[in-house]
């Protein structure tokens, strides 16, 4: 563990009421790394992800992002979220805005760009995710895969230093998953730092620098994909991967 | 898609032409009503360029004579002449009703939006908003008007800057009363609509760094206010009708004028029948207008799940 880790999560614990959902979770990432959180549903991986941009509040532990304590009560959370992009399982596109409107809202209202600049940036980002021909479509007029790509463009338009993906393909029909993964592959190639919660094991295997396996709110095992997938040290990891594989 | 190419049955064609005849009649009646109102107002405003102020736009005697010549309508000729004679008063009353309703509705909306927002997203302020809403909805509107007019004597506090806008200061008291009361009802409709905006919309707004207030302004309100239009139209329609309560604090709006005419002439049935038609015209206009507004601001997919 070096001092210049880009993201360092240390002993993060979280309770919902009486129930503890995260138990001393720790992991770290360098700039440009891709870390994939895997685990059964209810294992706390989405909650962990949301603690990083404070959509969920961890009660204990420390999350250092670029040297700054994310969990500090003095932190300006809006400032933090400006720099950390997030992509949701359910897309959560603004239903009253077109694709361009969705992507331009942050640059316009949060970053303070002019109307024209914000629109230009939105168009560039939509082009980046392959939606140059759907600029003025409303979310309801787009397929799930297209909506999720708008969601990615919306996060990218803020020029984040870290991207969080919360099961970005789980709500998609199988034939639409590919187009979203393709965009994500592209981001990996560009060197984006990404923390990803997903069940797409082939994606995880192909791009992850490290896999973190969570079960019951605890880190069971973590390591590079070849190690975790080929020679898991923990029995639970092996069982989980077998179960997942049999569904593929 | 077979049904789209199937020739319409006779019954369907009759129904279709009935509908278009109905629509035509409605448009004609609307044009007549608003034309009469507008011309009357312009005539009065310009000091009687068309006919002397206080005179009907068409001479009652002429109407009476014309109708008397038509066999089926001859029996109603005298009544029609009487009604035409009363139209200047009715036009003034109707105009005031329109103004009071429009101004109160707009001012009420300005108060209702923050009320609804604090009710849904506030903490302490949610209780203040709830208390306001319950107090204003839970007491009779007429009693509220009496408190403002007789109790607090607010008519004597109307600022000089606006006291000349209407012939009498009491009109402002009525507008204040309807604004405060209507805001409570409007807030209830808007609150319901805001609550139906999905939680994920707010999460997404916060996730790109918008503050809570900015998220409400840029994300929740544009959606929620669109959802609110159909139920909010109810408040519009109610306000047109309960603006007649202003008559009880001596505001010379439509009901007040009708009541005065009736008291002087004892033609209660006829006058209130005609007055009823005036209110009906206003209400129909309001609901048609709001349907137009709803269509105008509609966004594909937004609110579709609510129509199921």
Where are these regions (language model features)?
Chain B
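Transmembrane alpha-helices and adjacent helix-loop boundaries
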Residues: 2-308
């Amino acid at each position: 563990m070096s001092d210049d880790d880009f993201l360092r999560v240390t002993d993060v614990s979280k309770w919902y009421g009486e129930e503890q959902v995260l138990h001393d979770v720790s992991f770290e990432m360098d700039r440009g790394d891709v870390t994939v959180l895997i685990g059964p549903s209810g294992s706390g991986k989405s909650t962990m992800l949301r603690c990083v941009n404070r959509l969920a509040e961890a009660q204990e532990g420390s999350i250092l992002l670029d040297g700054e304590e994310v969990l500090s009560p003095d932190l300006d959370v809006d400032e933090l979220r400006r720099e950390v992009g997030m992509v949701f399982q359910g897309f959560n596109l603004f239903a009253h805005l077109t694709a361009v409107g969705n992507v331009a809202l942050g640059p316009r209202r949060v970053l303070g760009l002019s109307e024209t600049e914000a629109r230009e940036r939105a168009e560039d980002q939509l082009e980046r995710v392959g939606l140059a021909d759907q600029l003025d479509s409303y979310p309801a007029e787009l397929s799930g895969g297209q909506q999720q790509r708008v969601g990615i463009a919306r996060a990218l338009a803020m020029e984040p230093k870290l991207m969080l993906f919360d099961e970005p393909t789980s709500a998609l029909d199988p034939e639409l998953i590919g187009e979203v993964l393709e965009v994500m592959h592209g981001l990996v190639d560009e060197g984006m730092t990404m923390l990803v919660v997903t069940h797409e094991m082939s994606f995880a295997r192909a791009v992850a620098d490290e896999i973190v396996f969570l079960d019951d709110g605890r880190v069971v095992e973590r390591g590079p994909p070849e190690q975790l997938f080929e020679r898991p040290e923990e029995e639970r990891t092996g069982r989980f991967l077998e179960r997942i594989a049999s569904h593929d | 898609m077979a049904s789209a190419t199937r020739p319409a049955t006779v019954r369907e064609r009759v129904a279709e032409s009935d509908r278009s005849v109905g629509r035509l009649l409605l448009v004609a009646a609307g044009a007549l009503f608003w034309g009469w109102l507008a011309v009357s107002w312009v005539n009065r405003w310009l000091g009687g360029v068309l006919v002397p102020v206080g005179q009907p736009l068409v001479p009652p005697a002429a109407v009476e004579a014309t109708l008397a010549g038509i066999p089926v309508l001859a029996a109603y000729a005298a009544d029609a002449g009487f009604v035409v004679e009363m139209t200047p008063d009715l036009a003034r009353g109707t105009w005031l009703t329109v103004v009071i309703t429009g101004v109160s509705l707009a001012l009420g909306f300005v108060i209702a939006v923050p009320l609804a927002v604090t009710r849904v997203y506030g903490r302490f302020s949610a209780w203040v908003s709830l208390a306001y809403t319950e107090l204003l909805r839970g007491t009779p509107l007429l009693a509220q008007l009496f408190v403002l007019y007789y109790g607090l004597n607010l008519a004597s506090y109307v600022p000089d800057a606006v006291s000349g806008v209407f012939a009498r200061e009491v009109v402002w008291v009525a507008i204040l009363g309807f604004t405060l009361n209507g805001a409570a009802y409007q807030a209830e409709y808007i609150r319901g609509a805001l609550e139906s905006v999905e939680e994920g919309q707010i999460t997404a707004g916060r996730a790109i760094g918008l503050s809570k207030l900015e998220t409400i302004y840029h994300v929740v309100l544009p959606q929620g206010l669109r959802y609110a239009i159909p139920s909010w139209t109810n408040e519009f329609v109610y306000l047109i009708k309960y603006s007649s309560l202003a008559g009880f604090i001596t505001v010379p709006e439509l009901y007040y004028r009708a009541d005065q005419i009736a008291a002087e002439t004892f033609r209660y049935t006829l006058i209130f029948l005609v007055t009823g038609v005036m209110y009906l015209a206003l209400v129909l206009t309001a609901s048609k207008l709001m349907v137009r507004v709803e269509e105008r601001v509609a966004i594909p997919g937004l609110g579709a799940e609510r129509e199921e």
